[in-house]
Amino acid sequence: MPGVTVKDVNQQEFVRALAAFLKKSGKLKVPDWVDLVKLGKHKELAPSDENWFYIRSASTVRHLYLRGGAGVGSMTKIYGSRQRNGVCPAHYSVGSKNVARKVLQALELLKMIEKDPNGGRRLTAQGTRDLDRIAGQVAAANKKTV
């Protein structure tokens, strides 16, 4: 659909569609250790979804589309959560820096994002085009079901 952007569609549906696109393209470099790793020290278990790397990549690209200029540290804050400490009070804990770094590096290899001279990463023109195209597909699919 012309004129539809990422901001116009449901974020959950968009992230699922973008993750499916990244998986289907086969170009996203997925590390070997994805089935062994936790996503932060606040997590007790590894993710149960085997496609979590594609979903995290799609979520990261969407975040960069909305608020460019985010780096590894920003991504760890976004994906952080409450850490339970047993009988002690809970505190905030950041997400895994290695996962955030590998996601950003994999997206750089796809030429969807690039390093920003002011710090962090930002979307490329090709990345913006891809995201708007997928948003148009999601909007068209929603229009058919309504």
Curated annotation (Swiss-Prot):
<keyword id="KW-0963">Cytoplasm</keyword>
<comment type="function">
    <text>Component of the small ribosomal subunit. The ribosome is a large ribonucleoprotein complex responsible for the synthesis of proteins in the cell. Required for pre-rRNA processing and maturation of 40S ribosomal subunits.</text>
</comment>
<dbReference type="GO" id="GO:0006412">
    <property type="term" value="P:translation"/>
</dbReference>
<dbReference type="InterPro" id="IPR036390">
    <property type="entry name" value="WH_DNA-bd_sf"/>
</dbReference>
<dbReference type="InterPro" id="IPR001266">
    <property type="entry name" value="Ribosomal_eS19"/>
</dbReference>
<dbReference type="InterPro" id="IPR018277">
    <property type="entry name" value="Ribosomal_eS19_CS"/>
</dbReference>
<keyword id="KW-0687">Ribonucleoprotein</keyword>
<comment type="similarity">
    <text>Belongs to the eukaryotic ribosomal protein eS19 family.</text>
</comment>
<comment type="subunit">
    <text>Component of the small ribosomal subunit.</text>
</comment>
<dbReference type="GO" id="GO:0003723">
    <property type="term" value="F:RNA binding"/>
</dbReference>
<protein>
    <recommendedName>
        <fullName>Small ribosomal subunit protein eS19</fullName>
    </recommendedName>
</protein>
<dbReference type="InterPro" id="IPR036388">
    <property type="entry name" value="WH-like_DNA-bd_sf"/>
</dbReference>
<dbReference type="GO" id="GO:0000028">
    <property type="term" value="P:ribosomal small subunit assembly"/>
</dbReference>
<dbReference type="Pfam" id="PF01090">
    <property type="entry name" value="Ribosomal_S19e"/>
</dbReference>
<dbReference type="GO" id="GO:0022627">
    <property type="term" value="C:cytosolic small ribosomal subunit"/>
</dbReference>
<dbReference type="GO" id="GO:0005634">
    <property type="term" value="C:nucleus"/>
</dbReference>
<keyword id="KW-0689">Ribosomal protein</keyword>
<dbReference type="GO" id="GO:0003735">
    <property type="term" value="F:structural constituent of ribosome"/>
</dbReference>
<keyword id="KW-0539">Nucleus</keyword>
